[in-house]
């Protein structure tokens, strides 16, 4: 990765890796690329390297729109990695069709300096920040509240705070700045 990062900074093409390398370039576009990304996240990387598809693999997108944008990839990856089930409560927005479901990977999309969090069952502090990621561990469809575990912090988001969360199976490069991930998949057009 370091060698290819230097090559890219110098305006050179990256060296394509082999099976034992940590850097791969796979040519694909449009819907075929979308299907490939979903297969890499859900099957190939977990099977080959033991990655957890939700916790370890992050898709980084240049944009939100299009078949390989974060919006559409989140919709597809949620359907594959965390499909609806009778034992998975969820909250759905009728107008947009957006769904938050127990087990979903989510991102805080704006700073909230006042939301309290717990550590080890006791209130520990306040604040969730733009770019923080976690997993929804509980959903109350009646009150429209969700519980999100972000590292060692547990937050409870009320109905009026749910707009602060977005699915995070795929996020834009912009939103990921400052984060680190064990495995990254990044669709890049016209390379």
Model-derived regions, located:
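Conserved helicase motor core of P-loop NTPases
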Residues: 1-126
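Conserved nucleotide-binding/hydrolysis modules and their immediate coupling elements
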Residues: 75-191
């Amino acid at each position: 990765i370091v060698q290819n990062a230097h090559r890219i900074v110098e305006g050179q093409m990256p060296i394509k890796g082999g099976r034992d390398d940590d850097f791969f370039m796979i040519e694909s576009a449009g819907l075929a690329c979308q299907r490939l990304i979903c297969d890499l996240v859900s099957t190939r990387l977990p099977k080959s390297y033991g990655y957890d598809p939700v916790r370890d693999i992050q898709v980084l997108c240049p944009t939100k729109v299009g078949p390989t944008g974060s919006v559409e990839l989140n919709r597809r990856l949620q359907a594959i990695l965390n499909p609806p089930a009778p034992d998975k409560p969820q909250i759905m927005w009728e107008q947009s069709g957006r769904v938050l479901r127990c087990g979903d990977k989510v991102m805080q999309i704006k700073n909230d300096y006042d939301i309290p969090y717990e550590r080890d069952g006791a209130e520990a502090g306040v604040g969730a920040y733009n770019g923080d990621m976690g997993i929804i561990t509980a959903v109350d469809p009646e009150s429209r509240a969700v519980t999100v575990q972000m590292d060692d912090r547990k937050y409870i988001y009320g109905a009026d705070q749910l707009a602060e969360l977005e699915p995070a199976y795929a996020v834009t490069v912009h939103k990921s700045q400052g984060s680190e991930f064990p495995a990254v998949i990044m669709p890049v057009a016209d390379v």
